[in-house]
Structures are given as structure tokens and as C-alpha cells.
């Protein structure tokens, strides 16, 4: 009997609840139903707000539905699967643990059961592009790759289709990592900067959650860290296996680095020149960093020729400085992934001229002062919306250099109005970028929906 069969045998008489009846959880729910598990499908939405077909199919398959605002209260189950974005310390989940209920997640169980090598990426910025690059490198090299975590598809439902020679590549958030007790074979941390402080109790809690990606590794694991980032560099004391640094600013002894315009890799001080950074199709110096990160993760698995081929062809990921259209000489870009100041700074640096920027959104209780000097240098018109608009404006106006920089700051009611204002003020040769520096939850369920709406608005001009 294999590990998967043993797992399902161990929970055969357990009641298992899944939080959220969304597209990412449904394959997982049906996997457990098909294995004869007593499943409770839970969602904060009322039945009327959920697709009728989904509700009907779940009931027909034998799932019990627990719906509405109080769906987590007094759950009479043995195991709860929380969603990737659900706070581990949610009072209802704490109460469940106090009552002896097991609280876990798809990724935790997947790591326990996965038969193949795993590569996981976390960080405050650059996770998705780096994860996608790693998967693209490996696929181009000929590996069968399973992409999951925060991107791709749920991997636990397809666990029986994964072979030991495959490679699983996953993106992990701090919310997922905070409770994980198993680390991947290759851990990657892009950087760590203040983020999600509306959910994490302290910055230290956020940092420790990120560090959890590597603390359960063994001597035969690889850890890839950003030596240019003070916090990630500090993680080196917890590395148990091969320590690999990458750097945009300095040469390293073991890892990828930039030497002038040349991307290089030092393998125990033996340096290989890989390519000129100008070979990279993606715009922006932050994407050079993403390549340094991804190369450090796959070195020894992927040939240099494969790396160069991908660099020349890879067009990027949706919502990440994504070109939308050119209208009357004005270029529009969708950078909705910029949910933090550091991410917006990277987006601003990708262009060699001053921009018209659409910013603002949900308040994650992170400071905007670090954004201010870059905004003064790179933004000519800033159109702000959402709960953070005033805080962003205050940080910029109080920054040295604001007086005389010529920046115009405008407040709008919503994204529609922001696009209208940008369209009215932009002149031929201008660049308009949605780069909010904030999460989307004040108006959209996620940054993807915000980005899609922006593209719809721009394409309808």
C-alpha cells in the first residue's frame, strides 16, 4: 500500500471540512469524496451566492454543505482544510484546535505525500515570476513539472499521477508556510519586506513564517537566498544543506550574480558566464533579479543553453508589467501584482521615463515612506483611489525633493474614474501604469480581478 492509500485509510472514518467552495478547492473536495471520506464543504457565502450547478453537484456527490457567515463556528468535524489565504490564527481555527480538531492545508498534506523532488519559492516580491521561470526552465530541459501552490492547479488531487522522476514547483505564501512542518528539497526566498501586516500580528511573525520554508530541510537540500536583502541573508544561519546566494549587486562564491551586464554563476568559486542581461525579453531590472533567483534554483538540473533560450522567449506572467495596448501614442501597462510599495518601486524602475501611475487600494498597514523618493523620481501624475490614498499622498508630500518635482497628485472615486483621468491627461509618448502599491480587497477579491478590470477599461477607451 503506497503513502496516498495509507493516508486515506488513516482518515476513512474522519469527518473532513474544506473551507471555501472555490475553483481551487473543488478538485480537492471531489478527490476526498471519491475516496469515500465524509466531506463537509464550507463557505462564508449563502447558497444563493454560489453557482447552482456547483451546489447541486456537491450535494449529489455526497458532500454536506455548511454555508453562511457563521460557517466556521462550532464545526463538528475531525479535520479542517484551510484555504491558502486563511489566517492560521483566525479565532475560529484557534478554537477548533483547542477542541482537538486538526487544522491543515492542501500544501501540508501534499508535501507529506509527494513522491518526487520539490522546489518551493516564497518572498515578498517576485514569487510568481520566479516560480514560473523555474518551471519553464525545467520543462524546456525535458522534466515533467507540476506547478502549484499559489499558482497553477491544486496538486493534492493529482498526487497519484505524479511520478518520482517528476518535479513539483510551488509558490508558497506566508499564510501557507506559517503552519508547515516539512520543507522542500530546494527552498527559494526572493526577498522579505514589510507585507501582510494587516494579518500577521508583527513583522517578526511574518519573517518567521517566511523562514519556515527552509528550517525543516536536511543536509542534502538546497537553500537559495538573496544576499542583497538583509532579512533573507540572516536566514543563512538556519540553512542545513547547500547554501546558495544570488546577488544583483555583488559577486558571490556559490550562486548567480551580475558582473557588469553579464549574468554569471559561481559553482564553488568556479564561474560560468551565462548571458548578457540584455538577452532577457522581460523588461525591468527586477526581472534580472528574478532570473538570478531562478537560475540559482535550477543550476545543475538545467543547461546554460536552455536558460538562454527561455530568457529570449519567455514573455512574462499576467498582471506583471503586462503591456495592454497603445492608444494615440500612449502605452498602458497592467502591474496589478504590485500590492506593496517594494513591488511598485520595481515596476517604476522598469521604465526610463516618468509615468502616469494609478495607485492606492486596501490598507495592509505597511509604510509608504520607502516608496516616496522613487515616486518623486519616476512619477509625473499620480492618480490615487481607495482607503490608502491619503496615506500615500502624505508620505510623498513629506519626502525631501517633493517641492519642485512637478508631480501632480489626483484623487479619484474608483478605478474607472482613474482610467478616465489618465486617458484625458496622457499625451503621445506617455506611459500609464496600474501599479497600486496596495492589495485590492477594498474593491476586488484579488489583484487578478483588479488587473482584468483595468484591461477591460483600457481596451474600451
What are these regions (language model features)?
Residues 1-105:
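N-terminal leader/targeting and accessory segments in enzymes
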Residues 3-15, 25-35, 144, 275-379:
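Nucleotide phosphate-binding/pyrophosphate-handling subdomain across enzymes
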Residues 30-33, 72-75, 84-227, 231-241, ...:
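Phosphate-binding loop of NTP-binding sites
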Residues 32, 80, 121, 150, ...:
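Residue-level signal for inorganic ion chemistry
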Residues 38-46, 223-227, 358-359, 378-387:
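Short internal beta-strands
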Residues 39-43, 147, 169, 245, ...:
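Short beta-strand "acidic-cap" motif of Rossmann-like dinucleotide-binding folds
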Residues 43-44, 66-69, 104-108, 240-258, ...:
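Beta-strand->loop->alpha-helix junctions that form or flank phosphate-binding loops
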Residues 55, 371-429:
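C-terminal helical cap/extension that packs against the catalytic core
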Amino acid at each position: 500500500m503506497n503513502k496516498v492509500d495509507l493516508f486515506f485509510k488513516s482518515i476513512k472514518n474522519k469527518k473532513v471540512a474544506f473551507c471555501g467552495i472555490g475553483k481551487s478547492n473543488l478538485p480537492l473536495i471531489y478527490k476526498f469524496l471519491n475516496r469515500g471520506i465524509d466531506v463537509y464543504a464550507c463557505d462564508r457565502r449563502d447558497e444563493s451566492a454560489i453557482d447552482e450547478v456547483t451546489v447541486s453537484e456537491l450535494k449529489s456527490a455526497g458532500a454536506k454543505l455548511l454555508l453562511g457567515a457563521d460557517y466556521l463556528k462550532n464545526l463538528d468535524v475531525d479535520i479542517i482544510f484551510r484555504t491558502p489565504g486563511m489566517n492560521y490564527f483566525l479565532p475560529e481555527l484557534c478554537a477548533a484546535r483547542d477542541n482537538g480538531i486538526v487544522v491543515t492545508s492542501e500544501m501540508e498534506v501534499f508535501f507529506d505525500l509527494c513522491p518526487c523532488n520539490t522546489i518551493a519559492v516564497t518572498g515578498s516580491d517576485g514569487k510568481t515570476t520566479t516560480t514560473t521561470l523555474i518551471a519553464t526552465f525545467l520543462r524546456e530541459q525535458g522534466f515533467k513539472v507540476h506547478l502549484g501552490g499559489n499558482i497553477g492547479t491544486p496538486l493534492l488531487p493529482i498526487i497519484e499521477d505524479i511520478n518520482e522522476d517528476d518535479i513539483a514547483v510551488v509558490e508558497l505564501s506566508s499564510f501557507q508556510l506559517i503552519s508547515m512542518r516539512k520543507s522542500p528539497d530546494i527552498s527559494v526566498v526572493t526577498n522579505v519586506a514589510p507585507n501582510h501586516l494587516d494579518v500577521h500580528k508583527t513583522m517578526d511573525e511574518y519573517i518567521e513564517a517566511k523562514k519556515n520554508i527552509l528550517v525543516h530541510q536536511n543536509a542534502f537540500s538546497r537553500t537559495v537566498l538573496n544576499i542583497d536583502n538583509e532579512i533573507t541573508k540572516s536566514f543563512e544561519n538556519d540553512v542545513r544543506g547547500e547554501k546558495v546566494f544570488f546577488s544583483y549587486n555583488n559577486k558571490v562564491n556559490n550562486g548567480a550574480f551580475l558582473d557588469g551586464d553579464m549574468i554569471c554563476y559561481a559553482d564553488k568559486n568556479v564561474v560560468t558566464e551565462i548571458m548578457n542581461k540584455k538577452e532577457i525579453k522581460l523588461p525591468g531590472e527586477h526581472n534580472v533579479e528574478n532570473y538570478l533567483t531562478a537560475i540559482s534554483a535550477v543550476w545543475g538540473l538545467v543547461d546554460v543553453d536552455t536558460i538562454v533560450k527561455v530568457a529570449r522567449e519567455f514573455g512574462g506572467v499576467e498582471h506583471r508589467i503586462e503591456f495592454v495596448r497603445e492608444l494615440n501614442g500612449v502605452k498602458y501597462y497592467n502591474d496589478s501584482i504590485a500590492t506593496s510599495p517594494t513591488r511598485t518601486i520595481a515596476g517604476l524602475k522598469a521604465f526610463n521615463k516618468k509615468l502616469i501611475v494609478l495607485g492606492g487600494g486596501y490598507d495592509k498597514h505597511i509604510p509608504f515612506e520607502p516608496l516616496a523618493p522613487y515616486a518623486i523620481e519616476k512619477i509625473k501624475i499620480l492618480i490615487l483611489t481607495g482607503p490608502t490614498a491619503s496615506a500615500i499622498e502624505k508620505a510623498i508630500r513629506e519626502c525631501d525633493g517633493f517641492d519642485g518635482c512637478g508631480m501632480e497628485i489626483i484623487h479619484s472615486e474608483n478605478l474607472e474614474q482613474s482610467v478616465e483621468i489618465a486617458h484625458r491627461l496622457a499625451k503621445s509618448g506617455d506611459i500609464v501604469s496600474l501599479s497600486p502599491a496596495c492589495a485590492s480587497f477594498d474593491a476586488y477579491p484579488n489583484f487578478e480581478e483588479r488587473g482584468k478590470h483595468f484591461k477591460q477599461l483600457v481596451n474600451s477607451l
